[in-house]
From Swiss-Prot:
Highest taxon in the source lineage: Bacteria
Family to which the UniProt record says this protein belongs: Belongs to the UppP family.
Enzyme category, top tier: hydrolase
Miscellaneous notes: Bacitracin is thought to be involved in the inhibition of peptidoglycan synthesis by sequestering undecaprenyl diphosphate, thereby reducing the pool of lipid carrier available.
EC number assigned by the record: 3.6.1.27
Gene Ontology molecular function: undecaprenyl-diphosphatase activity
HAMAP family: Undec_diphosphatase
Reaction catalysis annotation: di-trans,octa-cis-undecaprenyl diphosphate + H2O = di-trans,octa-cis-undecaprenyl phosphate + phosphate + H(+)
Protein name: Undecaprenyl-diphosphatase
Pfam assignment, any one: BacA
Function of the protein: Catalyzes the dephosphorylation of undecaprenyl diphosphate (UPP). Confers resistance to bacitracin.
Native source species: Flavobacterium johnsoniae (strain ATCC 17061 / DSM 2064 / JCM 8514 / BCRC 14874 / CCUG 350202 / NBRC 14942 / NCIMB 11054 / UW101) (Cytophaga johnsonae)
Length: 265
């Protein structure tokens, strides 16, 4: 992987990580289009640059992120299902990650759901602040997030739909999804990095520089993406993301079956 390819992937990570469109699907398309090699460092890169995206949430919501102790316990409750199922289903999930068709189908199904989510969960009494989320609601949102263990589903999409199903407003559901991303993505990143460390994987000086560049780019782009997304949600719904996912899923299937087989990076 060269620096330009790293920047491209980091931009995609920053844009798609917090939008309900699946970062995995976009990484597949980008790696195919730009000829990015399917190698260990590429896999590690796509994991580590999530740290830059995570930092954008902490910076953007700095005051709100450091709220009451009760808020952290709610995040913990929402995070626990991902920890439990992630450990129990690790091998099964890794198997799914090898299949780009799974990603494409997930994009299509998720797109159809997003076309209807505003109609299903249009609640005039929706909670407008994450402080009003109950522990039971937090747990249910965490369970919804686990659906995103299926590649292509989108972690943010699953948790946002989960939040709206619990009578949260669109923006509140999205913001709680951002908060929940911090422990979830941080935990997943640490685990994967530890796995690479145990396997004896070593980084070259150039690779370290590429990781630094990737994180900086992902951080900046994610900041802009989150601000734009929240601003968009205050006036619009999820239909545009639904149509976008359907188009992306169709493109993936067409490329995979009629141009050349795709691989997961």
């Amino acid at each position: 992987m060269n620096t330009l390819q790293a920047i491209v992937l980091a931009v995609i990570e920053g844009i798609t990580e917090f939008l309900p469109v699946s970062s995995t699907g976009h990484m597949i398309i980008a790696s195919s289009f730009f000829g990015i090699a399917h190698e260990d460092f590429t896999k590690l890169f796509t994991i580590v640059i999530q740290l830059g995206a995570i930092l954008s949430v902490v910076v953007l919501y700095f005051k709100r992120f450091f709220q009451t102790l009760d808020f952290y316990f709610k995040l913990l409750v929402a995070f626990i299902p991902a920890v439990v199922l992630g450990l129990l289903l690790s091998d099964f999930i890794d198997g799914l990650l090898e299949n780009p068709v799974t990603v494409a189908v997930s994009l299509l199904i998720g797109g159809l759901i997003l076309l209807k989510v505003d109609e299903w969960f249009n609640n005039p009494n929706a909670a407008e602040t994450s402080q009003k989320i109950t522990y039971l609601q937090a747990l249910k949102i965490g369970l919804f997030q686990c659906i995103a263990m299926i590649p292509g589903v989108s972690r943010s999409g699953a948790s946002i739909v989960g939040g709206m199903s619990q009578k949260l407003s669109r923006t509140t559901a999205a913001e709680f999804s951002f908060f929940l991303a911090v422990p979830t993505m941080l935990g997943a990143t640490v685990k994967k990095c530890y796995d690479y460390y145990k396997a004896g994987f070593e980084l070259s000086h150039d690779q370290v520089n590429i990781l630094i560049i990737g994180n900086v780019v992902a951080f900046i782009v994610a900041l802009l993406a989150i601000k734009t997304f929240i601003s968009f949600l205050t006036k619009n719904g999820f239909k545009v993301f639904g149509y976008y996912r359907i188009i992306a899923g169709i493109i993936l299937l067409l490329i995979h079956f009629f141009i050349h087989p795709l691989t997961i990076i």
